[in-house]
From Swiss-Prot:
Location of this chain's protein in the cell: Cytoplasm
Lineage, highest ranks first: Bacteria, Pseudomonadati, Bdellovibrionota, Bdellovibrionia, Bdellovibrionales
UniProt-listed Enzyme Commission number(s): 4.3.3.7
Subunit structure: Homotetramer; dimer of dimers.
Native organism: Bdellovibrio bacteriovorus (strain ATCC 15356 / DSM 50701 / NCIMB 9529 / HD100)
Pfam families: DHDPS
Name listed for the protein in its UniProt record: 4-hydroxy-tetrahydrodipicolinate synthase
Biological processes annotated in GO: diaminopimelate biosynthetic process; lysine biosynthetic process via diaminopimelate
Length: 293
């Protein structure tokens, strides 16, 4: 099994004139590999998965695998609020060569904890590759409770969770309930260093598009016992991280990547639209302040 304890970028999907912009994607992948990230999540929230067709998802994954080879871990987002569809997409991800699947809590349906357990158990049982749970109640409304996560950690194939509430007490509670072998990945960039401080293993990040080397370094410092050093360094980037979420992700990060000259366009697909002028000015000023422009 691949190592899922590391720094993973939740990749944007670059667009140009309504199509996937593979030239910009290649520039982004080159920058990310140079920054030392351990892998990528493809077809996640940041990748605008709801507006990609099945063929686009497959084309995107295959292109990234061809460019990166086995140098990085590739995790495919396959979650939906339809268990049968999630199973179908998870099997496709396995066939394409994904190292793991990332499965979000079903949204809109508002299932009870019993339903969540059965959903994730059914998905994990349908494939041989590892399953990573994804808890993000800010988008799904429904949240996985610690007891449910503990029970799912015992299901064959369920290896970890992307915990995106930003609640450090909750992260600590899950770690105690599930043990150190259960992979804990932060889904909240602003609290990442504190997450590592209570025993977290890594991150699935948006900010790593812009500051990949720094995100990698923070984990290294914490693993070496230099938590305060990591805390002091992330403090320099707090305003930047906040601005990367000033509008719905991935709106700001696409603009940031365009400003950096990595993406040709900050184009998104409706219903998302490009970052407003006022917030663009704030983002650009902060990027210059911290030295990424």
């Amino acid at each position: 099994m691949k190592n899922f304890k590391g720094t993973f970028t939740a990749l944007v999907t670059p667009f140009k004139n309504g199509k996937i912009d593979f030239a910009s994607l290649d520039k982004l992948l080159k920058q990310q590999l140079a920054g030392g990230v351990d892998g990528f999540v493809v077809n996640g929230t940041t990748g605008e998965s709801p507006v990609l067709t099945s063929s686009e998802k497959a084309e995107l994954f295959k292109h990234i695998r061809n460019v990166c080879g086995d140098k990085v871990v590739l995790i495919m987002g396959t979650g939906s609020n339809n268990t049968a569809q999630t199973i179908e997409d998870s099997r496709k991800a396995e066939e394409m060569g994904a190292d793991a699947i990332l499965v979000v809590v079903p949204y809109y349906n508002k299932p009870p904890q019993r339903g969540l357990y059965e959903h994730f158990k059914a998905v994990a049982s349908s494939v041989k590759i590892p399953t990573i749970l994804y808890n993000v109640p800010g988008r799904t409304i429904t949240s996985l409770e610690t007891g449910t996560i503990r029970d799912l950690a015992k299901v064959k194939g369920v290896v970890g969770i992307k915990e995106a509430t930003g609640k450090i007490d909750l992260a600590s509670e899950i770690i105690k309930a599930c043990g150190s072998e259960f992979v804990m990945l932060s889904g909240d960039d602003g609290t990442y260093v504190e997450f590592l401080g209570v025993g977290g293993h890594g991150v699935i990040s948006v900010a790593s598009h812009v500051i990949p080397a720094q995100m990698v370094q923070w984990k290294k410092w914490v693993s070496e016992g230099a938590l305060d050093k990591a805390r002091a360094d992330i403090a320099k980037y707090n305003d930047l991280i906040n601005l990367l979420f000033v509008e719905a992700n991935p709106i700001p990060v696409k603009k940031a990547l365009q400003l950096m000259g990595i993406l040709e366009s900050a184009e998104l697909r409706l219903p998302l639209v490009e970052l407003g002028a006022e917030n663009t000015a704030k983002l650009q000023a902060e990027m210059k302040k911290v030295g990424v422009l």
